[in-house]
Amino acid sequence: MAGTVEDVRDENYKEFTDSPGAVVAYGLATCEPCKTYDPILEETAAKFPGIKVGKAKMHVPGRCREIKKTHTFETYPATHFFANGKPLLTRESVVEPAELVALTSDHLIK
């Protein structure tokens, strides 16, 4: 069963990343690897119900202006791990399912 991947945008970014554990994937509609990442994010959300998993759609006009001002992305998708508002880890490109589960477990589960 897949979990819920939340929509992350400027309006909810701080609240989302301030949670005890959050994974944010940044992507573009034109990015083929970003599309293949969606089911992996859903599986991760299902395995970790206490962790917020979200996706920031960087291509949608006006949704992520502030996020773009504070973050630089070399490639998409990019995945950031947060705990209580603090960035813990960044991964570029698609993170394979087993690695995403391991990183989430190792860095966000107390």
Predicted regions and their residues:
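N-terminal "domain-start" segment that seeds a small globular fold
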Residues: M1-E15
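Residues at alpha-helix caps and immediate loop-helix transition turns in enzyme cores, especially N-
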Residues: T36-Y37, E96
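Non-catalytic, surface beta->alpha helical segment in thiol-disulfide oxidoreductase systems
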Residues: E74-K110
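Short active-site neighborhood of thiol/selenol oxidoreductases, capturing the structured segment around
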Residues: T17-A29
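Short cysteine clusters
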Residues: C31-C34
